[in-house]
């Protein structure tokens, strides 16, 4: 009897769960941007009948429910669920999608355009997931990945305007130069905008503009700026701008401005003039803790000791300087107030390079070294795209001799010494060129 009782106790213990599984929600099928297909997912470690899914989409700066008529999505017995997220307007062009696993009895907030999701969704849900959709025409340029903005035939800001991701509006040519173009098609004007996939934070943002931009049509704006979709972020969307435009005032002798948002605050904006016919030009801003320094050059910037004439500089240390967060880098070409170019002509701006220089660039790491049959020394490194690197050599650690400089086209790059020889001892060092 004692043996049997003991065995039953052991079996009873083993049949009980050792620990509770954590509820989870995942997205199993996310339709590409522009698609009207449904969103699908999986709820795990919950009783399906006791829970529902609340889905929200983020379109052009606003969170909303795809439909107020069916605010909660039913979970099937196997944990799968499907939601129609394109119930009207520009829903197909949502850049973010959020799904919350909530109790069946929960009444979710019905959002028809708010800048942030209510905090109650986090406290009321047992699990959540958010995804960011990328552009179907995303591309790689200057060492980084970029999305192309499209409004799908709807008016989006800034402007508002129609934005197109067509290769008639945004493309990289065979020389590696980025083209942004405002086009006219079937009586409609389409603008262009690209957005970096990553945030960069503190450092120098440098734009090498090939085109003559002092004479842009008065209704046209060229914007080079950081921007955080979250309006509650410090510093007015963490927006720092180089903007080239006369803002529809053809008589304005100034054609450009540096801005720390919000621009309405006194001292957060300065206007200036790009010289007539100046091309190429280089426009930069260095963002650091509590400070931003802007500078524009008449020509392609190169590090010292070379020099390029400065057009203007401006520094701001006011209270609007943001700290880094989830800002992305934007480059756009658009129409002020959505007004067509006054001359009726299409507009194009070509940018040869973009470079980001961290405040303290890291020393590149060596991936491999080799000496080929011709005696050329090859050094494969990993650093930062578009930075200048200097290769030097020495036979005895006395005098270091410069062997050459290069701009790293990608994070991985190569330096070479054609004068190397297996019969001669040499030591090498690689450094980030100062003054970038």
Region roles according to the model:
Residues 6-17:
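Bacterial N-terminal signal peptides
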Residues 32-33, 195-205, 271-279, 322:
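Extracellular/lumenal carbohydrate-interaction signature centered on repeated Trp-anchored short motifs
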Residues 66-81, 91-93, 102-106, 135, ...:
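Aromatic sugar-binding interfaces of carbohydrate-active proteins
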Residues 134-232, 236-248, 306-309, 327, ...:
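Low-complexity, Ser/Thr/Pro/Gly-rich disordered linker/stalk regions
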Residues 205-207, 279-287, 292-296:
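Short tryptophan-centered beta-strand motifs in secreted/extracellular beta-sheet-rich domains
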Residues 231-279, 291, 334-337:
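Glycine-aromatic-enriched beta-strand/loop faces of beta-sandwich-type recognition domains
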Residues 361-436:
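Short, composition-biased motifs enriched in small/polar/acidic residues
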């Amino acid at each position: 009897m004692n043996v049997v009782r003991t065995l039953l106790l052991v079996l009873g213990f083993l049949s009980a769960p050792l620990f509770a599984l954590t509820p989870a929600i995942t997205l199993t099928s996310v339709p590409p941007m522009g698609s009207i297909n449904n969103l699908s997912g999986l709820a795990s470690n919950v009783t399906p009948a006791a829970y529902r899914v609340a889905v929200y989409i983020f379109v052009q700066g606003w969170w909303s429910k795809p439909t107020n008529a069916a605010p909660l999505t039913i979970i099937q017995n196997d944990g799968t669920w499907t939601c129609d997220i394109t119930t009207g307007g520009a829903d197909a062009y949502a850049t973010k999608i959020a799904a919350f696993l909530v109790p069946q009895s929960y009444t979710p907030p019905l959002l028809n355009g708010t800048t942030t999701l209510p905090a109650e969704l986090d406290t009321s849900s047992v699990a959540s997931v958010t995804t960011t959709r990328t552009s179907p025409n995303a591309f790689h340029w200057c060492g980084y990945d970029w999305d192309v903005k499209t409004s799908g035939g709807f008016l989006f800001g800034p402007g508002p305007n129609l934005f197109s991701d067509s290769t008639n509006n945004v493309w990289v040519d065979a020389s590696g130069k980025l083209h942004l173009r405002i086009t006219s098609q079937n009586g409609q004007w389409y603008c262009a905008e690209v957005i970096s996939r990553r945030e960069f934070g503190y450092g120098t943002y440098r734009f090498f503009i090939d085109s003559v931009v002092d004479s842009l049509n008065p209704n046209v704006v060229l914007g080079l700026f950081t921007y955080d979709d979250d309006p509650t972020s410090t510093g007015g969307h963490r927006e720092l701008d180089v903007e080239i435009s006369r803002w529809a005032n053809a008589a304005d002798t100034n054609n450009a401005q540096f801005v720390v948002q919000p621009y309405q605050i006194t001292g957060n904006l300065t206007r200036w003039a790009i010289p007539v016919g100046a091309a190429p030009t280089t426009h930069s801003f260095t963002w650091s803790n509590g400070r931003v320094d802007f500078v524009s050059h008449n020509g392609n910037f190169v590090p010292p000791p070379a020099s390029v004439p400065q057009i203007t500089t401006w520094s701001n240390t006011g209270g609007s300087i943001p700290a880094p967060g989830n800002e992305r880098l934007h480059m756009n070409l658009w129409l002020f107030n959505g007004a067509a170019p006054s001359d009726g002509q299409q507009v194009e701006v070509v940018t040869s390079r973009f470079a980001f220089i961290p405040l303290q660039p890291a020393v590149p790491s060596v991936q491999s070294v080799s000496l080929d049959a011709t005696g050329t020394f090859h050094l494969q490194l990993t650093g930062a795209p578009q930075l200048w690197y200097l290769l030097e050599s020495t036979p005895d650690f006395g005098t270091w001799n410069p062997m050459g400089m290069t701009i790293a086209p990608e994070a991985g790059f190569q330096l070479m010494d054609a004068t190397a020889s297996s019969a001669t001892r040499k030591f090498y060092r690689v450094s980030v060129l100062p003054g970038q």
